């Protein structure tokens, strides 16, 4: 993991908004989606990881995508540079085995 690793989290109303955000984010920055959470009735949170600047770029693209999605609404968002290891260990923001190939590709580790 890069010393400049960051986590970004965005919460929206409606699944189409989070789907649009996810697609825009992976296209805009070299980030990895580490998961999403259904946070309540029609509320969804998407969590991403990557280099600080890449996360900032991806978050801006995700917010823009949500704002362009009919019926979707950004409720809140945050970017945390270099999250503390205790935060990573407890909250669902770490890389899982399922997303490892995407992390490797985003970080340029997969040279196939």
Swiss-Prot record:
Ranges for domain BMC: 6-92
This protein's GO CC annotations: carboxysome
Cellular compartment(s): Carboxysome
PROSITE patterns, per the entry: BMC_1, BMC_2
UniProt KW rRNA processing keyword: no
Pfam families found in the cross-reference section: BMC (PF00936)
Source organism, top-level taxon: Bacteria
Principal subcellular localization: other
GO BP terms, alphabetized: carbon fixation; photosynthesis
Subunit structure: Homohexamer. Interacts with full-length CcmM. Forms mixed heterohexamers with CcmK3, probably with 1:5 CcmK3:CcmK4 stoichiometry. Only very weak interactions with CcmK1 and CcmK2 were seen.
Free-text function comment from the UniProt entry: A probably minor shell protein component of the carboxysome, a polyhedral inclusion where RuBisCO (ribulose bisphosphate carboxylase, rbcL-rbcS) is sequestered. The central pore probably regulates metabolite flux, as might the gaps between assembled homohexamers. Homohexamers make sheets that probably form the facets of the polyhedral carboxysome. This subunit probably makes both homohexamers and heterohexamers with CcmK3.
Domain remarks in the Swiss-Prot or TrEMBL record: The tight homohexamer forms a pore with an opening of about 4 Angstroms in diameter which is positively charged.
Name used for this protein in its record: Carboxysome shell protein CcmK4
